[in-house]
Amino acid sequence: MATTQSETDCYDIIEVLGKGTFGEVAKGWRRSTGEMVAIKILKNDAYRNRIIKNELKLLHCMRGLDPEEAHVIRFLEFFHDALKFYLVFELLEQNLFEFQKENNFAPLPARHIRTVTLQVLRALARLKELAIIHADLKPENIMLVDQTRCPFRVKVIDFGSASIFSEVRYVKEPYIQSRFYRAPEILLGLPFCEKVDVWSLGCVMAELHLGWPLYPGNNEYDQVRYICETQGLPKPHLLHAARKAHHFFKRNPHPDAANPWQLKSSADYLAETKVRPLERRKYMLKSLDQIETVNGGSVASRLTFPDREALAEHADLKSMVELIKRMLTWESHERISPSAALRHPFVSMQQLRNAHETTHYYQLSLRSYRLSLQVEGKPPAPVVAAEDGTPYYRLAEEKEAAGMGSVASSSPFFREEKAPGMQRAIDQLDDLSLQEAGHGLWGETCTDVVSDMMAPLKAAITGRHMPDSGPEPILAFYSSRLAGRHKARKPPAGSKSDSNLSNLIRLSQVSPEDDRPCRGSSWEEGEHLGASAEPPAILQRDGDGPNIDNMTMEAERPDPELFDPSSCPGEWLSEPDWTLEGVRGPRAQGLPPRRSHQHGPPRGATSFLQHVTGHH
């Protein structure tokens, strides 16, 4: 067992958690405290020296943050010797990608997605206060702290790609954001700001629900094509201003066309670049609204007599999709900010409370909401309060005092659920097409194992009238996308340079949108009331770049395109005085009508008829 030491402490290296191109992450024992830590180890050379200096600068900027309240990883110390650099962080359990992999990439319930989203938004809000862009938000960089003791409590990690707005030119990263989570302004070469992280978080939310990346592009053309096919083309003025528009779009040959631009066809792209576009999506959505129809999301709306619990869960999912739509806009100026997202009804549970407060689903969601914000040794500190000023988490406590808590706690709905081991998706809904990826990201097979996802729903509707006969929905079953073995995501052949740093919008500490007075009449009007966010994160990055933060990964994502840092200008763009309109994708068509079923009289109908005939 190797040993290394700083000026003040000594560390025993227990095991190597992961290795990367430029270093490794090891699990170590800190002798002074007896705690296990994560040690990020990089070789001592000129290139890595610049990387370390950038990360240390950001960690220094965040030294005043409380890592627990800000949901960022706790940094302990840095030291070096003649051969290596060492950064010591707290040891966390696993990242969201590893968690998904353990559970066969089964869809995560909306209430758990809210718990994760809330914490990441708090982190982004605090980073914005410090004028920091994370620039590499993805499942691998969101870590579960301790899933047994604190379910779905997370922290943001890996600040190797992060940058301070005013000093972003000194960041030596060869790319901005991992491709699957890359914002349109980065893809198109438009001015960008901290809202690139909001786009990434929206993609992560969709992926947690789908069990598969929303836009898993093999290259930037595929990435833009996927977004266009789901959300429609960007507005013409966006493409007029975009430096890289000609890479993906061409002028419309029809002068009378509504949009003077059109997306290049796959054949055009192949002829120009000799690179064949690939289809790697599992769910080919024609609008973001269709997200709620995947993985049984619309079951409650199609039941003859929907259960209250099913209705509550479906309403929650619908609210989540509305937030995702606000996060995934072509135009960054139309995109919701972290502080406004914290007040969105999905995150604050405002709509759920108003319409479904008496359901077990609401109580369970409330409990998860409260626990995610609770810091050990401190009372829970709510981010969002009810309209009357009462913190939402107290609603559950008041009900427990009134005797309702005992009923809720004894209910099977309050048992901590594990994600099912198999995905279940409903086919032939609207225009949604389910398709096995022609080129698997992780490998994928079909099985005959039936998902147990609907077990809680079936239990909830026990005793209610169900149709006696009728066709069942056509189901598509997907097993682990690892195909029973851990297969690495292989990077595509041939990367192209991609310089994006010249697009930066230099921001002040507070955006103009946050200076408006809060009238409190709606969640959007109070968007400047951001929640506290906090410090950075550590150890983890897949094969997307030189930093080795995500080394615990067995499966790696493809390498995004690189850019030449020397091409970055030294001058900064002034804040633009133009305002662009957002683009909303086409809305999904209504669900096809179900076939009518012969139903018996509802419960209680016989006694009612007897009552009527008895009076006549």
UniProtKB/Swiss-Prot annotation:
GO MF annotations in UniProt: ATP binding; protein serine kinase activity; protein serine/threonine kinase activity; protein tyrosine kinase activity
Polar residues composition-biased segments: 496-511
UniProt binding sites for ATP: 17-25, 40
Keyword Cytoplasm: yes
EC number: 2.7.11.1
Reactions catalysed: L-seryl-[protein] + ATP = O-phospho-L-seryl-[protein] + ADP + H(+); L-threonyl-[protein] + ATP = O-phospho-L-threonyl-[protein] + ADP + H(+)
Modified residues (Phosphoserine): 511
UniProt domain Protein kinase: residue ranges: 11-347
Post-translational modifications reported in the UniProt record: Autophosphorylated.
One term under GO cellular component: nucleus
Gene3D superfamilies: Phosphorylase Kinase, domain 1, Transferase(Phosphotransferase) domain 1
Cellular compartments annotated: Cytoplasm
Region (Disordered): 485-616
Main EC class the enzyme belongs to: transferase
Record family assignment: Belongs to the protein kinase superfamily. CMGC Ser/Thr protein kinase family. HIPK subfamily.
Name of the protein in its database record: Homeodomain-interacting protein kinase 4
The gene coding this protein: HIPK4
